[in-house]
């Protein structure tokens, strides 16, 4: 039996170094599917430790195609998997934040557990998805936003894809994506499906010395800042950790309706995002987009508070800035350099 599997079966936890070695073995296909399934199942049942997660992250980053990042880029990649079928809030908020001046490196994928993944909705919006690291950097420099399609940067994940699919439940890999941005973003807004997992991820990420990261987990189950319930926030900034709760009314939002945010397909999600940018959507959809874009603007260092960031995001949408940015992002490379 694999020695790490034996340790887990015996009820022991792994050191960060052991977890790193274990993940390296998974990424290099040096374990059988049943060994991987056994370990992932035990970890999911007992819960990972911060040391284990930090070791896994270190290995994931080592196996990824990484790019020397641009300074002060922001990622808005969350864990997904909240099961509520909302439109692509983090993708919409990334576009708004980039229109307000934030440099966004949006890390994402096609849908795995949701109705619409970030790559799916960008395709529906006719936004160019960059295919190389150089094109991503160029897009960020030109338009303040680039998209990192996860499979292009984490090719070693193919060795665990089959096992994850067969298991069918959330594993540690749901937590690793947001902590493994290929442009090594030190500023992030990370939506998490539970506050317990948010705390775990924050403890693991602290060892990598982030500049400014917000983990958000709302009490209505969204992995976003919510306008239908209070949201628990863990904020890492310049070596300090703060934990607090925000409510929609503190930011001038009336309590929204969850049904106004739900979609059944990437096409519906894209349609709703376009309506938000054209000031034709429900107040719930507008408010939640501005709230989450505000967090990205704040972590980018453009504003001094989340409230100011949210106000700037609202102004960016209502003034037509977000709609204009969407049109810029639709341009093909040959049009940009013409």
Curated annotation (Swiss-Prot):
Superkingdom as given in the UniProt entry: Bacteria
Cofactor(s) the protein needs: Mg(2+)
Entry note: cofactor: Binds 2 magnesium ions per monomer.
Record keywords, A-Z: Amino-acid biosynthesis, Aromatic amino acid biosynthesis, Glycosyltransferase, Magnesium, Metal-binding, Transferase, Tryptophan biosynthesis
Protein's gene: trpD
Binding site for anthranilate 2: 164
InterPro entries: Anthranilate_Pribosyl_Tfrase (IPR005940), Glycosyl_Trfase_fam3 (IPR000312), Glycosyl_Trfase_fam3_N_dom (IPR017459), Glycosyl_Trfase_fam3_N_dom_sf (IPR036320), Nuc_phospho_transferase (IPR035902)
Source species of the chain: Bacillus subtilis (strain 168)
Record-listed E.C. numbers: 2.4.2.18
Name this protein carries in UniProt: Anthranilate phosphoribosyltransferase
Catalytic activity: N-(5-phospho-beta-D-ribosyl)anthranilate + diphosphate = 5-phospho-alpha-D-ribose 1-diphosphate + anthranilate
Lineage: Bacteria, Bacillati, Bacillota, Bacilli, Bacillales
């Amino acid at each position: 039996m694999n020695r790490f599997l034996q340790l887990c079966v015996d009820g022991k936890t792994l050191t960060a170094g052991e977890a790193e070695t274990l993940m390296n073995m998974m990424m290099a296909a040096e374990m059988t599917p049943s060994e991987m399934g056994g370990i992932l199942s035990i970890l999911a049942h007992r819960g990972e430790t911060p040391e284990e997660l930090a070791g896994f992250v270190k290995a994931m980053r080592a196996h990824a195609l990484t790019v020397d990042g641009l300074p002060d880029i922001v990622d808005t990649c969350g864990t997904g998997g909240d099961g509520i079928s909302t439109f692509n809030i983090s993708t919409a908020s990334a576009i708004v934040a980039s229109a307000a001046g934030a440099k966004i490196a949006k890390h994402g994928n096609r849908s795995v557990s949701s109705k619409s993944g970030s790559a799916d909705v960008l395709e529906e919006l006719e936004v160019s998805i960059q295919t190389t690291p150089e094109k991503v950097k160029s897009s960020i420099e030109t338009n303040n936003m680039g998209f990192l399609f996860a499979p292009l940067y984490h090719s070693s994940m193919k060795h665990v894809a089959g096992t994850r699919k067969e298991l069918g439940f959330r594993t540690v890999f749901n937590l690793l994506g947001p902590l493994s941005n290929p442009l090594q973003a030190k500023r992030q807004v990370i939506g998490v499906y539970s506050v317990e997992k948010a705390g775990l991820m924050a403890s693991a990420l602290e060892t990598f010395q982030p500049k400014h990261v917000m983990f958000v987990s709302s009490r209505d189950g969204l992995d976003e800042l919510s306008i239908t319930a209070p949201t628990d926030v863990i904020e890492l900034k310049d070596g300090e950790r703060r934990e607090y709760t925000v409510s929609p009314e503190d930011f001038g939002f009336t309590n929204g309706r969850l049904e106004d945010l739900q979609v059944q397909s990437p096409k519906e999600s894209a349609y709703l995002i376009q309506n938000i940018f054209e000031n034709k959507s429900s107040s719930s959809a507008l408010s939640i987009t501005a709230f989450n874009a505000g967090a990205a603007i704040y972590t980018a260092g453009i504003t001094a508070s989340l409230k100011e960031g949210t106000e700037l995001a609202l102004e960016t949408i209502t003034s037509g800035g977000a709609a204009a940015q969407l049109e810029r992002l639709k341009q093909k490379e040959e049009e940009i350099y013409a």
